[in-house]
Structures are given as structure tokens and as C-alpha cells.
Amino acid sequence: MDPSGPGFQRSWSMKSLIICVSTSHGNTRRVADRMAEVLDAEVVEPESVDPENLCQYDLVGFGSGIYYMSVDTRLRKLIRRLPHVDGIRAFTFLTSGAGQIPLLDYSKPVRNQLASKGFKVLGSFTCRGFDTVGPFGFIGGINRGRPNDHDLEHAAAFAARVRIRVAGSPAAS
């Protein structure tokens, strides 16, 4: 059965939330919106999240662009404020102009913080995004048109795999 198709949703329902910070060009929001289609999730900004209410969700996504080699301050602040939870499934997703630098796993600090709060982190998705920050602005930016359709389909496939993992877990029934 196609996990992104309507038959899957009818056979099992889960409550999902995607928390997203997307400031410069809307790169991360485009990824969040595509994942939300697959997960039937609401996409919100960190300021609109009541940390105490996250226990209502089966799955929570945390997404941000990478700004000067780190996730956005607003997402970091929200994660610090989160209470300890009992195994809520989570995932991370990031967009970056420079792409993933092999020795710098941008999602690792976020994954570790979420795990320390009791979240079960199921995976991370990253892709390139259009970037005009700093010196890139002088040359018209890098990765124009990213994330592109191919990137968004990869994001949807990632979300579908996460959805299957949540549906197959004992806590999901």
C-alpha cells in the first residue's frame, strides 16, 4: 500500500505536528509543507507551540534552515523548554545552502537534545536550499531553485518511511 496515499490514512490515523523555522527564502517551509501532505500534519512556528501540549501527538517533526552552521535560535529555545516526554516519536529536517559538511552533522545536537527529553528520534532529512547569506549574496546566491521537485520528492519519501515506522510501532495502535 502506498504510505503517502489516501488508503493508508484510512487504515490508520496518527496525529502529527511539524514545527518549522524558515526565514530567508522559504526553503525549509517548502520541505515542511511537502512532508505535511504525506503525514497529514499541521505546520507551525516554534512560537505557537505550547510545549506541554506535545504529548497529544504521535509524531513531531522539528525543522530549520541552517544559519551560520546551526539551527535557528527559535527552534533551539523551544527544544530547551520542552518537558520530558515518554517516547513521542520525532524526526528532524534541515535545509542548508552549503549542504551537509561531512564532519559537521547539523542535526546531531537537535537529535541529542530531543533524545535527552525522552523523544524517540526516528531519523533526519537534509537537503540543499537557495542561499544568499554573506558572500553568497555577492554572486547572486547558491543553489538557486533548491529545494527542487527532486528534493521535495525525497522529503516526501522520507516522511512516508517515518509514517510507516510510527504505524508499525506498538505505541501507535
Regions found by a protein language model. Give the residues of each.
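Selective for proline/serine-rich intrinsically disordered segments
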Residues: 1-4, 145
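Short, Lys/Arg-enriched N-terminal segments with co-localized hydrophobic residues
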Residues: 3-13
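FMN-binding flavodoxin-like domain, especially the glycine-rich phosphate-binding loop
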Residues: 9, 16-23, 29-30, 34-44, ...
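Conserved SAM/SAH-binding loop
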Residues: 46-49
